[in-house]
């Protein structure tokens, strides 16, 4: 059984064709600059690149070219489109309606449209991608897998904001959380590595990329997470501010005479470690600058590590203890220095790190010592595989 996994952005599209017998990706691809000049599709099969450069006026044209690349006689991996048993779509926001992945039909599409106000940047391209696939592959079942779904198990006291209740009732303003597919995947792998049932464990998962969030997992369910109503909340990130005093936004509008759009640009695109360091949103650049004595770069890293450490501490209280901590995503998987700094100060939990193991980059490994009371893992995330597994399970029903 082969499943196509699609992740649509506003002008880009990532895809993988996964053979579910071996759970291996037969092809991985990226389409860039959809709807703008210089459109390009890059597909990798067995390490070899295949590139298509031609105008793609919209996502439908992009998906046409994806299918063309997959069945290409020389560079493709399937002989016919009928080999694609189903398509799994990453959808950022499922609102309160969806606590798990769902088979897509017209009713689901209407619900996704209703969620656009909650995710105006992300849901529209997700919807466009689904519509394009449904048009081109009308007989192929499609499944929506939501970033928010895993966090629908948060208790009401964890997701409710202390605002007038009617803002929740009438406008859906509450904590939703994101990166759910990643948190679900790595917590499951951690339990496998420990040889225990996830339902018997207390796990804190740290998805640390340009966007970053933590999740507290208890009895196999998400009970707390750091992102909120939007992916702007929580930790300091690459370009996002994370949690700040909300009155700062009023100050920016009233005293600094900034428009809502200008404020939005500051807190979403000019803040985080980029804002503090003035160097970059790329942690590799900031780490390099800090080593060369750039004080603002060092401060940016210190603030970032502090917000992660602080949140881990809070989540041990939420869970009443912790059995395992997992690092994943770009920084979590690849920066030994960041992992060390984040865990520095959590010795009271009985955490002991093996310095040599911690030097490993981007591979699945336990980095805690044998006598560490809390297991610490680095687990590369695989959201595409999780989407494919859900798609297989739902279409088999």
Swiss-Prot record:
TM segment ranges: none
Q: Name one GO biological process term.
A: acetate metabolic process
Q: Which InterPro entries match?
A: Ac/propionate_kinase (IPR004372), Aliphatic_acid_kin_short-chain (IPR000890), Aliphatic_acid_kinase_CS (IPR023865), ATPase_NBD (IPR043129)
Which Gene3D superfamilies does the UniProt record give?
3.30.420.40
Q: Which organism is it from?
A: Clostridium botulinum (strain Loch Maree / Type A3)
List residues binding substrate.
90
Name of the encoding gene: ackA
Q: Which Pfam family is one of those matched by this entry?
A: Acetate_kinase
Q: Which UniProt keywords apply?
A: ATP-binding, Cytoplasm, Kinase, Magnesium, Metal-binding, Nucleotide-binding, Transferase
Give the co-factor note.
Answer: Mg(2+). Can also accept Mn(2+).
The entry assigns this protein to a family as follows: Belongs to the acetokinase family.
Which residues are Mg(2+)-binding? 7, 383
What is the name listed in the Swiss-Prot or TrEMBL entry for this protein? Acetate kinase
* UniProt site (Transition state stabilizer): 179, 240
Provide the residue positions that the database annotates as binding ATP. Answer: 14, 207-211, 282-284, 330-334
């Amino acid at each position: 059984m082969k499943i196509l996994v699609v992740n649509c952005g506003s002008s880009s599209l990532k895809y993988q064709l996964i053979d579910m017998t071996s759970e291996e990706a037969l092809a991985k691809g990226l389409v860039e600059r959809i709807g703008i000049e210089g459109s390009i599709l890059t597909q990798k099969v067995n390490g070899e690149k295949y590139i298509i450069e031609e105008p793609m006026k919209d996502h439908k044209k992009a998906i046409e070219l994806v299918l063309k690349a997959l069945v290409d006689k020389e560079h493709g991996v399937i002989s016919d489109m009928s080999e694609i048993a189903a398509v799994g779509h990453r959808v950022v926001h499922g609102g309160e309606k969806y606590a798990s992945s769902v088979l897509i039909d017209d009713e689901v599409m209407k619900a996704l449209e209703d969620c656009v106000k909650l995710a105006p940047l992300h849901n529209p391209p997700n919807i466009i991608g689904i519509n394009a696939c449904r048009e081109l592959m009308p007989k192929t079942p499609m499944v929506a897998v939501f970033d928010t779904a895993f966090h629908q198990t948060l208790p009401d006291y964890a997701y409710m904001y202390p605002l007038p209740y009617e803002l929740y009732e009438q406008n859906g303003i509450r904590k939703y959380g994101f990166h759910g597919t990643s948190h679900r995947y790595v917590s499951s792998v951690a339990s496998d590595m420990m040889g225990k049932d996830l339902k018997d464990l207390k796990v804190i998962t740290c998805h640390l990329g340009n966007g970053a969030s933590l999740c507290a997992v208890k009895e196999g369910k998400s009970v707390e997470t750091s992102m909120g109503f939007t992916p702007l909340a929580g930790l300091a990130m690459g370009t996002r501010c994370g949690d700040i005093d909300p009155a700062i936004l009023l100050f920016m509008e009233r005293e600094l005479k900034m428009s809502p759009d200008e404020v939005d640009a500051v807190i979403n695109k000019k803040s985080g470690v980029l804002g503090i360091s003035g160097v970059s949103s790329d942690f590799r650049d900031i780490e390099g600058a800090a080593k060369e004595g750039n004080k603002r770069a060092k401060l940016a890293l210190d603030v970032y590590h502090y917000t992660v450490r602080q949140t881990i501490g809070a989540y041990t209280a939420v869970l009443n203890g912790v059995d395992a901590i997992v690092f994943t995503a770009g920084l979590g998987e690849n920066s030994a220095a960041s992992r060390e700094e984040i865990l520095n100060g959590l010795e009271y939990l009985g955490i002991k790190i093996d310095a040599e193991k911690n030097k490993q980059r981007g591979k699945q490994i336990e980095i805690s010592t044998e006598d560490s009371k809390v297991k610490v893992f680095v687990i590369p995330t695989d959201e595409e595989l999780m989407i494919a597994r859900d798609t297989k399970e739902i279409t088999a029903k």
